[in-house]
Amino acid sequence: FGFKMLGVEWLVSASAVGSLQEGYRPLDIVVPDQFLDRTRGRSSTFFGNGVVAHITFAHPICSTMSRIASDSVESVGKKVHRGGTYVCIEGPQFSTLAESRLYRDWQMDVIGMTNLQEAKLAREAEICYATLALVTDYDCWHPDHEQVTVEMIVQNLQENAETAKEVIHQVVSKLPAERTCDCKSALSEAIITRKDAIPSRVRADLAPILGKYLEITE
């Protein structure tokens, strides 16, 4: 919400993930294009208190932002995986072995605890979003690698942190002047509640997001 108030149109995040596939190795970077939600009770919408909206979310990552992010990883000489499915778990505990094996059976590619809610809220705010999933470990499924520990994650994440900074710098330099994707109008056909039925308090609270559709001037 704060990003929207600041006028942000493009958003790229970076976070640690575990790999669920042999080919996604520690220190690789994945730019996922799909998510599976295994969280419980997290706030992941701006709506529901007097206004109902249902955004299209079949493709949760901005294709333009994803391409720019992937190209930027390659431009700094690092291994990038274009696309993949990120399973978002509740945490803060890591997976059990049974869960890790199940997600592999489901053909998930990486596992993390944060990015899905970011993607949902960014889409509702009509912000173009992509994430750099920094592989730090093989979760706990791999028989030839030790179980994930915080120490392991931090060590690999620190090594990837400098890479992420370089990549984000490249991303910013490659952003187009104007957006042509559908993200910028994600709410245009998503608002179900009649304009005159939206409470004045809600209209005011959500003015940065709904203003252009409800003819609200901030």
Feature map (PLM): residue ranges:
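General beta-strand structural signal in soluble alpha/beta enzymes
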Residues: 11-15, 31, 80-83, 87, ...
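Histidine/lysine/aspartate-rich catalytic loop segments that bind and position anionic ligands
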Residues: 49-93, 125
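Metabolite-binding pocket within alpha/beta catalytic cores that recognizes anionic/polar moieties
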Residues: 1-58, 214-218
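Active-site/ligand-binding-proximal alpha/beta "capping" segment
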Residues: 72-109, 185, 192, 196
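A short, charged, Gly/Pro-tolerant segment at domain boundaries
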Residues: 180-218
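His/Asp/Glu-rich mid-to-C-terminal helical/loop segments that flank catalytic regions of hydrolases
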Residues: 140-188
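Zn-dependent metallopeptidase/amidohydrolase metal-coordination segment
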Residues: 113-150
